[in-house]
Each structure stands twice: as C-alpha cells, then as structure tokens.
C-alpha cells in the first residue's frame, strides 16, 4: 500500500493514488491538474520516508473533480429568561481532488489495476 501525507489548506491529509479527497477550497478550475509539493511523508514498498519538514523530490499529482459546499452547521446562542436568541448557519466550501500519482525517487506510484473477476462455469 502506497500513501503520502500532504499539507494543503493548513491541514494534513493522508492520500492514496486512485482515491478522491475533499480539501479546503482551491482557486483552480474543474478538471485542472495540480501538484502538491508539501509532502510530509511517503510510504511505499521499500519503507517510509519522513520529511524534515518535507520530503525532498516528492510530489503528489492530482486533478480537480468539483467544487462544493459541505453540510450546513447551525450555531444557536441563547440567554435563558432574557429573550436573547441568535441563530446562524455556515456551509464550508471545499474542493474534491482525485489523486492520480505519487512521485518519489524517480518512480511514479499510481493506483493498482483491479483484478478482473474470473467466472467459473
């Protein structure tokens, strides 16, 4: 299993090739390619490499699938017996990113091809 930990939007995200993740809003168009250069850790068949603070020569390639809004969070404040009530809502915007490959030490790790089902008759 190959994975990497990248920093984006002030958060650390564990990513694997072939999967999508919701990260903080990125100011790029849909279907645009992007590269995460702040790779903090890379785990591959040969072991794990931890960066100090980042892994030199490592990059994660991805593609933007869509932009969206998360579920609404409601904040309700009230003071009992005083008639003070405030209700606010917030929907955080996000970007859905498909991770295509993890590049490290001259190699590119992509999603493994799924084995085709063999039917026995």
Swiss-Prot record:
Database matches in Pfam families: Ribosomal_L21p
Keyword rRNA-binding: yes
Keyword RNA-binding attached: yes
Coiled-coil ranges per UniProt: none
Keywords linked to the UniProt accession: Ribonucleoprotein, Ribosomal protein, RNA-binding, rRNA-binding
InterPro entries, A to Z: bL21-like, bL21-like_sf, Ribosomal_bL21, Ribosomal_bL21_CS
GO cellular component: cytoplasm; ribonucleoprotein complex; ribosome
Molecular function, one GO term: rRNA binding
GO biological process annotation, one example: translation
Family: Belongs to the bacterial ribosomal protein bL21 family.
Protein task: This protein binds to 23S rRNA in the presence of protein L20.
Quaternary assembly: Part of the 50S ribosomal subunit. Contacts protein L20.
Name used for this protein in its record: Large ribosomal subunit protein bL21
Organism: Gloeobacter violaceus (strain ATCC 29082 / PCC 7421)
């Amino acid at each position: 299993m190959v994975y990497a930990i990248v920093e984006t939007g002030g958060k650390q995200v564990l990513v694997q090739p072939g999967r999508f993740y919701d990260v903080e809003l990125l100011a790029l168009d849909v279907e645009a390619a992007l590269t995460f250069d702040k790779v903090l850790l890379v785990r591959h068949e040969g072991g794990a490499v931890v960066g100090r603070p980042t892994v030199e020569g490592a990059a994660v390639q991805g593609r933007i699938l869509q932009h969206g809004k998360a579920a609404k969070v409601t904040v309700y404040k009230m003071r009992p017996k005083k008639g003070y009530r405030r209700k606010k809502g917030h929907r955080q915007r996000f970007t859905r990113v498909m991770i295509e490959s993890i590049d490290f030490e001259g190699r590119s790790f992509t999603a493994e091809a799924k084995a085709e089902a063999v039917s026995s008759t």
